[in-house]
């Protein structure tokens, strides 16, 4: 039968600064199942180093270490963690209980890393009953005495029913009464067949063991078995265990992820102020992203409405002072357009879809005791569809009304507000420059175009404006709707040639200009997109700052919880388990801040809309992007602290001061 533990010529060397310490120098040792072994020696003798290697908390530099005949030197760090979870139970001088957890949760902690499904609460309670603490299961460690805390640690060591109990100075922080109670528990466990390996420097404690090993300067100088205390006879036959380690299945299938989630959120809630400050950075960042993007989307929507009002594929032709070879001509040398020009342009075959003459002026509007100065625009029949000006309330002019110079008017919403207030203006008679007009429609709201209010307008038939109101015999401009965007260049060239030919203008005569509304639309759209990107970038920077804050907090948390990490590794946590738990904590904080920030961002954008009078639009895309980005920030900025935590060696973490 193979011995339970076997060391062959084991060496262990530590480098402390420039000093080399030979903790173990060629130690050979066998321990059988059922033995109760006490390892003694002065400080620096190597007794703790020997226990750490036997418990797979540390690895030898040289020599062989076997468990039940299996060489464990070649196992990976994760495989050794699995063996510790299956085979070993640890009791430490400092207890190493997690203060934020109840004692029953402390006891069942090793099961989280076992890869086994289940709650295991009843099993943990049974172990607490074994050490006499069944009445204290929902207490926290700081509500217990030192002796009670050590009994909780023993219950935790027993919960996985290990082959071996490793006890490192288990009574070092206890008085004589509590020490005796703890040793009675160890004695009872030994009688039941447990193998116990204990480090102590007290002779009265070592007296409970059936075998005492004394070390000095990294060597075993004495190894005595007490004749009257033989190894427990309760253990018979060979035992096997999963030497490859536990918990190798999917964390989703074996229930580990649920345990990690619970552990992570317990840690988050344990430091409420720190968590609040960490979440605050993400909250501000996400709220800024949502609010800024809502403002950007609102501006974009408003701009789109204005662009829509301009019409698509539109050319605007206006007359102006002639310039021949750069020299301005007199006022008489001005290209003035007539209805014949409109008809000629409209007849340009496949290039032009519609054309409308427009005349502009000012209007003094009077209704009852109300009067208002506004812009007067005379338009043709096709203008309504070309410039998206067909009234939502009322109707557009008929061709006959334009031909007979009918005194009908369509007024903008600003005029309605100033003249009629909340009453319906349709069918009412108003005076425009002292001439009676019947209101037949309300123009669609278009908002502001720069400083100009596009809704402060009165639209009448172009013939009426020219011959009844303004006394003009020429048009102010001609609007042309080109058949398709691809024909804009050809249409401009054809119209230019047509006007020059008809008005007998020289080649270099620029007494008229043609403005491409599509180019204006592109420019405005580009400006809006740039503004949205700028606002989003500013908000994203604040989100990144919040992420850096999360990383700082997590790095501090790793340092503060170094011993906790060491404990988790001692009871079977693998590197990925530790890393995942810290990642869950960082992502949990960022997602929490992100979700709160989403609601706050929507609220802030609505408040801005209310006070500034600027429409905002919160899109689902911005919400999804902000929330997803906050989660990614949790992963990105939490990865370094998580990797740092996972890289800690269990023995180094446990003795961290």
From Swiss-Prot:
One GO term of the biological process aspect: response to antibiotic
Transmembrane segments: 276-296, 538-558, 596-616, 620-640
Membrane association type: Multi-pass membrane protein
Subcellular location field: Cell inner membrane
SMART domains the UniProt entry points to: AAA
Matching InterPro entries: AAA+_ATPase (IPR003593), ABC3_permease_C (IPR003838), ABC_transporter-like_ATP-bd (IPR003439), ABC_transporter-like_CS (IPR017871), MacB-like_ATP-bd (IPR017911), MacB_PCD (IPR025857), Macrolide_Exporter_MacB (IPR050250), P-loop_NTPase (IPR027417)
A molecular function GO annotation: transmembrane transporter activity
PROSITE patterns in UniProt: ABC_TRANSPORTER_1, ABC_TRANSPORTER_2, MACB
SUPFAM superfamilies: P-loop containing nucleoside triphosphate hydrolases (SSF52540)
Domain ABC transporter, first and last residues per copy: 5-242
Keywords noted in UniProt: Antibiotic resistance, ATP-binding, Cell inner membrane, Cell membrane, Membrane, Nucleotide-binding, Translocase, Transmembrane, Transmembrane helix, Transport
Domain of life: Bacteria
EC number: 7.6.2.-
Family, similarity comment: Belongs to the ABC transporter superfamily. Macrolide exporter (TC 3.A.1.122) family.
Function in brief: Non-canonical ABC transporter that contains transmembrane domains (TMD), which form a pore in the inner membrane, and an ATP-binding domain (NBD), which is responsible for energy generation. Confers resistance against macrolides.
Protein name: Macrolide export ATP-binding/permease protein MacB
Species the sequence originates in: Chlorobium phaeobacteroides (strain DSM 266 / SMG 266 / 2430)
Taxonomic path: Bacteria, Pseudomonadati, Chlorobiota, Chlorobiia, Chlorobiales
Gene (name only): macB
């Amino acid at each position: 039968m193979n011995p339970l533990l076997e060391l062959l010529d084991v060496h262990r060397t530590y480098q402390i600064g420039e000093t080399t310490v030979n903790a173990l120098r060629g130690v050979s040792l066998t321990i059988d199942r059922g033995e109760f072994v006490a390892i003694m020696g002065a400080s620096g003798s190597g007794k703790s180093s020997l226990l750490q290697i036997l418990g797979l908390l540390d690895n030898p530099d040289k020599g062989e270490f076997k468990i039940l005949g299996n060489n464990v030197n070649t196992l990976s760090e994760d495989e050794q963690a699995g063996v510790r979870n299956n085979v070993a139970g640890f009791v430490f001088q400092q207890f190493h209980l997690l203060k934020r957890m109840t004692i029953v949760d402390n006891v069942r902690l090793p099961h989280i890393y076992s890869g086994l499904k289940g709650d295991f609460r009843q099993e943990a309670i049974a172990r607490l009953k074994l050490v006499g603490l069944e009445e204290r299961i929902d207490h926290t460690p700081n509500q217990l005495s030192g002796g009670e805390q050590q009994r909780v640690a023993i219950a935790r060591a027993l919960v996985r029913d290990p082959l071996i109990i490793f006890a490192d100075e288990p009574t070092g922080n206890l008085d004589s009464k509590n020490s005796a109670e703890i040793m009675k528990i160890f004695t009872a466990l030994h009688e039941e067949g447990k193998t116990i390996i204990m480090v102590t420097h007290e002779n009265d404690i070592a007296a409970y063991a059936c075998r005492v090993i004394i070390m000095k300067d990294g060597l075993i100088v004495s190894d005595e078995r007490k004749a009257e205390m033989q190894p427990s006879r309760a253990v018979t036959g060979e035992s096997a265990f999963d030497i490859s380690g536990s918990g190798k299945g999917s964390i989703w299938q074996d229930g580990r992820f649920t345990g990690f989630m619970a552990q992570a959120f317990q840690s988050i809630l344990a430091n409420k102020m720190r968590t609040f400050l960490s979440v605050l950075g993400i909250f501000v960042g996400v709220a800024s992203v949502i609010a800024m993007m809502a403002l950007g989307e609102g501006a974009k929507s408003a701009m789109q409405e204005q662009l829509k009002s301009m019409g698509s594929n539109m050319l605007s032709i206006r007359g102006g002072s002639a310039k021949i070879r750069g020299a301005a001509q007199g006022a008489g040398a001005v290209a003035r357009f007539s209805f014949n020009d409109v008809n000629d342009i409209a007849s340009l075959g496949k290039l032009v879809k519609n054309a409308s003459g427009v005349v502009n002026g000012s209007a003094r509007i009077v209704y009852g005791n109300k009067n208002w100065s506004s812009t007067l625009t005379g338009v043709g029949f096709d203008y309504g569809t070309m410039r998206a000006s067909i009234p939502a309330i009322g109707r557009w002019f008929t061709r006959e009304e334009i031909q007979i110079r009918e005194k009908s008017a369509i007024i903008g919403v600003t005029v309605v507000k100033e003249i009629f207030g909340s009453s319906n203006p349709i069918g009412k008679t108003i005076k425009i420059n002292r001439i009676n007009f019947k209101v037949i429609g309300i123009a669609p709201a278009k908002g502001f175009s720069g400083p100009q209010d596009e809704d402060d307008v009165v639209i009448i038939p172009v013939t009426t404006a020219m011959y009844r109101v303004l006394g003009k015999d020429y048009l102010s401009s001609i609007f042309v709707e080109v058949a398709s965007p691809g024909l804009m260049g050809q249409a401009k060239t054809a119209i230019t040639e047509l006007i020059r030919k008809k008005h007998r203008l020289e080649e270099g005569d620029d007494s008229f200009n043609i403005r491409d509304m599509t180019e204006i639309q592109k420019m405005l759209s580009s400006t809006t997109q740039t503004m949205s990107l700028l606002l989003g970038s500013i908000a994203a920077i604040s989100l990144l700052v919040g992420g850096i804050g999360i990383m700082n907090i997590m790095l501090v948390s790793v340092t503060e919880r170094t011993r906790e990490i060491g404990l988790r590794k001692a009871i079977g946590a693998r590197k990925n388990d530790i890393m995942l738990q810290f990642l869950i904590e960082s992502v949990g904080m960022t997602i929490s801040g992100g979700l709160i920030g989403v609601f706050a961002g929507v609220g802030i954008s609505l408040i801005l809309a209310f006070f500034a009078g600027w429409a905002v639009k919160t899109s689902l895309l911005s919400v999804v992007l902000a929330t997803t980005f906050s989660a990614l920030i949790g992963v990105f900025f939490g990865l370094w602290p998580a990797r740092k935590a996972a890289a800690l060696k269990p023995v180094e973490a446990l003795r961290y001061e």
